[in-house]
Amino acid sequence: MNQSHFFAHLSRLKLISRWPLMRNVRTENVSEHSLQVAFVAHALAVIKNRKFEGNLNAERIALLAMYHDASEVLTGDMPTPIKYYNAQIAHEYKKIEKIAQQKLVEMLPEELQQDYRMLLDDSYTSEEERAIVKQADALCAYLKCLEELSAGNAEFTLAKARLEKTLQLRHSPEMDYFMTVFVPSFSLSLDEISQDSPL
């Protein structure tokens, strides 16, 4: 049986810092970001199913979110303003991401490739699944801004404003629910979020 370097590569996602051009009170890496996006995407899918007559596989969406930035272990994390500077750059970067996704799949033993291709390759996801993961990704970036601003880091002021516009564009009932019920807590201290539920 041949060795595979797939999971050794994925373990290096923790070495890739997000927000590399900005001063951070606390550095965030791609691995922890991916887990948070999985938490939020799963929640959005559950909210849609329970509150807004959705019919999504919330567990699959959590997995898609968990792997949504996996290709960055080969490409690195390109800052959003550069990645989307114009349509041509965005298009070319998408092609690079696609190649990286395929390279990751090819690292796996052949008998596992199709299972992971379904998670790594965007062409195997529905428009609705992609939309939920994109909403969660934008929400998590927004939450990072709130945390940095709460810690006194004004560096994230413009990023927060930009992400508010992005969230408006990706608006959905489930996102509104999440924003109303869960987001306000991210601006509170540990003592404030622990008051109602002491151990």
Curated annotation (Swiss-Prot):
It comes from the Bacteria. Residues 30-142 form the HD domain. GO terms for cellular component: cytoplasm. It catalyses: a 2'-deoxyribonucleoside 5'-phosphate + H2O = a 2'-deoxyribonucleoside + phosphate. Its cofactor is a divalent metal cation. It holds the Pfam family YfbR-like. The record marks R18 as: Appears to be important in orienting the phosphate for catalysis. Its EC number is 3.1.3.89. It is found in: Cytoplasm. One of its GO terms (molecular function) is metal ion binding. It is an enzyme of class 3 (hydrolase). PROSITE patterns: HD (PS51831). Substrate binds at R18, W19, H33, D69, D77, M78, P79, T80, D137. Belongs to the 5DNU family. Homodimer. PANTHER family: 5'-DEOXYNUCLEOTIDASE HDDC2. Catalyzes the strictly specific dephosphorylation of 2'-deoxyribonucleoside 5'-monophosphates. NCBIfam families: PRK03826.1. This is 5'-deoxynucleotidase PC1_2775. It comes from Pectobacterium carotovorum subsp. carotovorum (strain PC1).
